[in-house]
Design a protein with these regions (language model features):
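Thiamine diphosphate
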Residues: 1-130
Length: 130
């Protein structure tokens, strides 16, 4: 996503148009056109606070998971920031697997295997509280 706020504006605009034109065929937002399968979990990630990707949550019917950088980081690089706040590629994979486990598509053991493979410490302090 290049701009969560632009996607939200599109969805809000379409929603408003549909409300104001009840006798016409409803328009479909970009989100509805691109994420139309209600079975597939969506993992939305941002280098900003979770509220940034969360602003589109009401327009997504799919199971929705959000990763963001809530709190204060101790990072001098973007890569360090993503690792500290658990939003790097490894945590995106981990959250995607968790979403599939939650839906019953995978066994829980897959999560542990991924954590081992990517050296994810289950006892790492929560970045929001550290």
């Amino acid at each position: 996503v290049t701009s969560y706020s632009e996607i939200r504006k599109d969805a809000e605009s379409i929603s408003r148009w549909n409300m104001n034109h009840p006798n016409e065929n409803p328009q479909i937002s970009f989100l509805e056109r691109t994420i139309s399968n209600n079975e597939i979990p969506v993992v939305a990630v941002s280098d900003y606070i979770k509220m940034v990707p969360n602003q589109i949550s009401s327009y997504i019917k799919n199971p929705f998971y959000v990763l963001g950088t809530d709190g204060f980081g101790r990072s001098d690089t973007r890569e360090g920031l993503r690792k500290f706040f658990e939003i790097d590629r490894y945590y995106i994979v981990l959250n995607s697997l968790k979403a599939l486990v939650d839906r019953g598509n995978l066994q829980k053991s897959v999560i542990k295997k991924a954590m081992d493979k990517y050296n994810i410490d289950s006892e790492k302090p929560d970045p929001i509280n550290s």
